[in-house]
Structure formats: C-alpha cells, structure tokens
C-alpha cells in the first residue's frame, strides 16, 4: 500500500497547478516600475538635451516609492509654474526673450525651466482671439518657489532694460508684464522677494526723469558722486524703498548709450521706472529730496570757496579754488597794495624832469654868453668887415682881410666876374685868338683885374705894368706882392669900383701863378717881349714865374663885340 502514499502525499501536477503565484505577484509590479522608470529616464534625457531640466533635478526625482504608483503624480503636481506675458514688450526685448540662448541662460541662473508659449497678437487679434488661443508668454516651471522667483526676476530685468532703451531712443508708453500662476492646491500664490511687491496681473511700467540741474557746477564739486552717494548707496536706498529702477543718465553720468556708444546729449538726470504710478511718484519724491540735499551742499561749497577767495570774481577758476593751502589765497590781499606801486613809477619820470628844469636855467647863462660869441666870429668878419671897409679910404683893413682869403686862389674869381660878361677864364681856342698875348683895351668893360691889387691903378697903367714890369724877386709871395706895390697905391675914385665888384663876388681876385704860366709860357713870353722888357737881368730862367702879370681873362678878339653870357655866344 505504499503506492498510495505517494499518491496521497501529492497529486498529479499540471501547468496550472505550478506554485509561483506568490513570487510572480511580487515580481510583476517590479517589472512595471522598471519600465516606467526607463520611460521617465528617457523623457528626462530629452529634457536635459533641450535644456529644460538639469541633472540635479533628475537625481532628486529618481527615487520612487514602491508602495504606491501615485507618488510620481504627486511629485508632478508639486512643481511651481509661472507664466510671464511678453506679447506687449518692445520688439527688441521680445526677440531677446524668445531666443533659446537667452532662455538657457535664465535656466542656468535660476534653476527653473523656461519655454516660449502662445503667439504674438496685436490688440485687435487679442480682442477676437478664442480662450484657447493665448498671446505670447514665457512658461516658467520649477520645483520650488525660489527657483521660479529667480527666473521671473531675471525676465523682468531683461524687460526693464529693453523698456529703458526704448525710452531713450523713442517714446514708449510702457510694457505689460502679466504673471500667470497655475492653480493648484499646494501653491496658491507665487511670492516674490520680501523687499519687492508681488507681481499683480497686467501691471504697466511707467518712467520719469528728474534733472539734476548742476550742469554749470565747479569741477571741484563732483555732482555724480554727490547724487549717487558712496558706492551708489543713495540710489540703491531709493530702489529698496520703492521697488523702482533708479539710475543716473545724461552728460557726466558715465552711462553710455547702446545706440551711440557715448553719453546722452541731455543734461544729467535721474531715470526712474516703476510698474505702478504710485511707486513711481514715491521714487520721484525721494529723488527730488536727494537733489535738494545736493543743491544745499553745493551752496555751502560755494560759500566756502567765496570765503577762501578775497575776490569773488575769481570763484569760477576751479584750479585755484581746488588748491588745499589757504594762505596763498590771502596773499592776493598783499598784491592789492602792489597795484598802487606800479602807479608811482609814472611820477618818478616826472620827478627827474623837475630837477632837470632848474638845472637848465643855471647853465643857460653861459650858453647865452657863448651864443653871441659863436655866431659873431662866423658872421661878423664876413658881413661887418666888408661893409666897414667900403666907407673908409684906408687901404689897410681890406689888405689885412685879404691874406686869409688868398689860400682860395684856385677859386678863379675871374670866372665869376666874367660870368657877367659871358666869358670864361680858360683858353678856348688858339693862343693868337685869345688875350693872352695882347693887352686889354683901355676903355673895355671886360677888363677885370684883381680887386685888391689893381684897385688903385688906372686901367691903362695897370695894363702897362703887366706888360713892362719885371716879375717880383720872391716868387713865393705871388699874389701879396702886387697889392703891396707902392706905385700902385689906390686912389679914392678907383677904389670904389673894385670894392663893389668884390662885394658882388665875395671872392679874392686871382692874379695867376707859376703853374699857369708854365701852361702857356710860349705865347705869353712872346707878348711880353713884344711890349718890351726893361730889365737886363730878365733871363729865360726867370720867365716861368714872370707870367703872374697875365690875367686869366679871355677877351673877345673884337673890342666892339657886345657883352653876352658865354652860353648865349654864337
């Protein structure tokens, strides 16, 4: 009966009676989770490739509870989602936000995924659009609210910069940034940073300008530093209090415009931008208070500079005002007394003139005594002696005055006297045609003898003396010998005629000398011998000095010729 034991101990086994439902029950769910995990990993890899997720997010989402398969759905519901509308922002800003590179940069900075949703619509299209058709917006998704806040703040900053650029280049009313929240039980709202207000739906950015008004300030007063404060602490305080964007722009602000690459042409001003008009007004009030304080500081600065400078007219030069040492500025007071100092120099030249005036009268008497002395010898002998010699008959004064004049024997008074007759004293033709060898006619007016010597002798006697008398013994005397002859003493009636001629000529008569004789010794000698030579000792060697008797006057060949100037002679 052993046969029945095994039969009783076990029944016939079939494929349906295989034991393993317990093991299969435990292994079946495991295979489904693995498959789900593989699909999730593939999806995560795709998101990472697109930049939508980060590896850290995948690792945090990998562990899944095996107890319930609803854990993944719960994790998905915990994601925070925000939507920022960019349909109405400026075109440049909208193009920048829709670029994949910009969205990747926002994802790296904030840790939240950013993607573009919807499409661009105009105002008319918005009014006619269906509820399912939404305008252009950015979809931001993150695991925590902080990550989403970072992404939204970054997007808002980009939009603000775009609004500012549009405001500087053209008038722009403002951009509408709408933040959408995904309704969920776990995340009712998306709070922002504690110091910034919440993002209400449909807010508009408004802006304003507050001009500083210190464009003409001195260089020593740094307006930019006074407005911004140490490390821009003043403007940062206004931003923290009002949530507005406040920064300095314009000339001297150091803010370069993106379009031109240089500062704006407008005067320095504070640019204010805020989503709400109330916040803009409060920020503007704070900026005005700040500028009032800066103006008060500048007034004190000017007062200080004016107190340092004695002359307020020189307040403007910044270099002088900026010098730290004050004593040099008090020194100009010392220069002021020096200004009268240049005035005395003009009087000193006048002072020397006064001493010069008294000195001049003192020496004046001696010059007065000398003045008559100097002109008298110059004029008296020439003017007084000549007329004085005319009235008296004494021949001595004229003879004494003649010796100083004889040195001018080369002046040839015959020429001057003969100019009245129109004849020259030189030979102008053959000797036989001149008067060198013949005596003068008795009654001719052309005879001109030496005024000093021939004045006392008649014309006939003078001519005969010239032809018959031998020459003087001393040839050196020349002219003085003939005037001193005793037989030629002048007579009163004959004296006046030569004196008148001397008065007219003002020169001493020329009686000739040995040099003149040598020029024409042949003809003169023949003439003398023809007239007769009484001296037996009249030797040929005496002939050269003898011709002094010949006057250097040229007589016309015909005594009846009419007198006329030589330049009018035919």
Curated annotation (Swiss-Prot):
Subcellular location: Nucleus; Cytoplasm
Protein's UniProt name: KH homology domain-containing protein 4
Keyword set, alphabetical order: Cytoplasm, mRNA processing, mRNA splicing, Nucleus, Phosphoprotein, RNA-binding
Molecular function terms, GO-annotated: RNA binding
Region span, Disordered: 1-29, 391-410, 438-500, 512-570
UniProt source species: Danio rerio
GO BP, one annotated term: mRNA splice site recognition
Family matches, as Pfam families: KH-I_KHDC4-BBP, KH_12
Record's subunit section: Interacts with PRPF19.
Membership in a protein family: Belongs to the KHDC4 family.
CDD domains for the chain: KH-I_KHDC4_rpt1 (cd22385), KH-I_KHDC4_rpt2 (cd22386)
Domain remark in the UniProt entry: The C-terminal part is necessary for the interaction with the PRP19C/Prp19 complex/NTC/Nineteen complex. The KH domains mediate RNA-binding.
Main location: nucleus
Coiled-coil segments on the chain, per record: none
KH domain sequence ranges: 77-157, 210-292
GO cellular component, one term: nucleus
PANTHER family the record matches: BLOM7 (PTHR15744), KH HOMOLOGY DOMAIN-CONTAINING PROTEIN 4 (PTHR15744:SF1)
Protein role: RNA-binding protein involved in pre-mRNA splicing. Interacts with the PRP19C/Prp19 complex/NTC/Nineteen complex which is part of the spliceosome. Involved in regulating splice site selection. Binds preferentially RNA with A/C rich sequences and poly-C stretches.
Ranges annotated as biased composition (Pro residues): 391-407
Positions of the UniProt region annotated as Required for nuclear retention: 427-497
Comp. bias (Low complexity): 553-562
């Amino acid at each position: 009966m052993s046969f029945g034991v095994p039969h009783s101990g076990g029944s016939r086994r079939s494929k349906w009676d295989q034991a393993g439902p317990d093991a299969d029950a435990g292994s079946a769910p495991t295979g489904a989770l693995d498959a789900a995990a593989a699909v999730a990993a593939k999806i995560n890899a795709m998101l990472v490739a697109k930049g939508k997720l980060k590896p850290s997010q995948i690792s945090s989402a990998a562990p899944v509870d095996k107890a319930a398969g609803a854990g993944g759905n719960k994790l998905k519901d915990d994601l925070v989602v925000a939507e920022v509308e960019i349909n109405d922002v400026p075109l440049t800003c909208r193009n920048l936000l829709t670029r994949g590179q910009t969205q990747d940069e926002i994802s790296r900075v904030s840790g939240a995924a950013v993607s573009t949703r919807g499409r661009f619509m105009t105002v008319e299209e918005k009014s006619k659009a269906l509820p399912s058709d939404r305008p252009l917006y950015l979809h931001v998704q993150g695991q925590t609210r902080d990550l989403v806040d970072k992404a939204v703040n970054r997007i808002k900053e980009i939009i603000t910069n775009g609004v500012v650029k549009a405001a500087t280049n053209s008038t722009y009313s403002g951009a509408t940034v709408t933040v959408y929240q995904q309704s969920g039980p776990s995340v009712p709202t998306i709070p922002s940073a504690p110091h910034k207000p919440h993002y209400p739906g449909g807010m508009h950015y408004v802006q304003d300008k507050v001009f500083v008004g210190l464009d003409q300030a001195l260089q020593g007063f740094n307006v930019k530093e006074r407005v911004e404060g140490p490390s821009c602490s003043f403007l940062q305080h206004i931003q923290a209090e009002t949530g507005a964007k406040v920064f300095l722009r314009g000339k001297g602000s150091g803010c370069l415009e993106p379009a031109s690459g240089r500062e704006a042409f407008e005067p320095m001003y504070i640019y204010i931008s805020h989503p709400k008009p109330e916040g803009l007004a409060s920020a503007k009030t704070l900026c005005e208070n700040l500028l009032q304080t800066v103006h008060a500081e500048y007034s004190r600065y000017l007062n200080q500079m004016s107190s340092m400078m004695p002359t307020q007219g020189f307040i403007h030069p910044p270099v002088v005002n900026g010098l730290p040492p004050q004593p040099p500025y008090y020194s100009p007071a010392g220069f002021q007394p020096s200004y009268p100092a240049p005035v005395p120099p003009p009087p000193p030249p006048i002072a020397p003139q006064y001493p010069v005036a008294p000195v001049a009268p003192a020496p004046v008497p001696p010059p007065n005594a000398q003045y008559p002395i100097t002109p008298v010898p110059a004029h008296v002998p020439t003017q007084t002696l000549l007329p004085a010699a005319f009235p008296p008959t004494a021949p001595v004064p004229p003879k004494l005055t003649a010796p100083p004049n004889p040195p001018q024997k080369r002046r040839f008074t015959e020429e001057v006297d003969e100019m009245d007759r129109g004849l020259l004293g030189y030979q102008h033709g053959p000797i036989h045609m001149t008067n060198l060898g013949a005596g003068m006619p008795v009654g001719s007016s052309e005879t001109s003898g030496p005024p000093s010597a021939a004045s006392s002798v008649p014309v006939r006697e003078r001519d005969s003396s010239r032809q018959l008398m031998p020459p003087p013994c001393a040839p050196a005397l020349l002219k003085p010998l003939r005037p001193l002859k005793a037989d030629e003493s002048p007579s009163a009636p004959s004296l006046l005629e030569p004196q008148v001629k001397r008065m007219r000529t003002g020169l001493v008569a020329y009686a000739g000398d040995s040099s003149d004789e040598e020029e024409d010794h042949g003809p003169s000698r023949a003439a003398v011998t023809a007239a007769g030579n009484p001296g037996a000792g009249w030797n040929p060697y005496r002939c050269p000095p003898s011709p002094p008797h010949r006057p250097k006057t040229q007589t016309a060949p015909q005594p009846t010729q009419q007198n006329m100037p030589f330049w009018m002679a035919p």
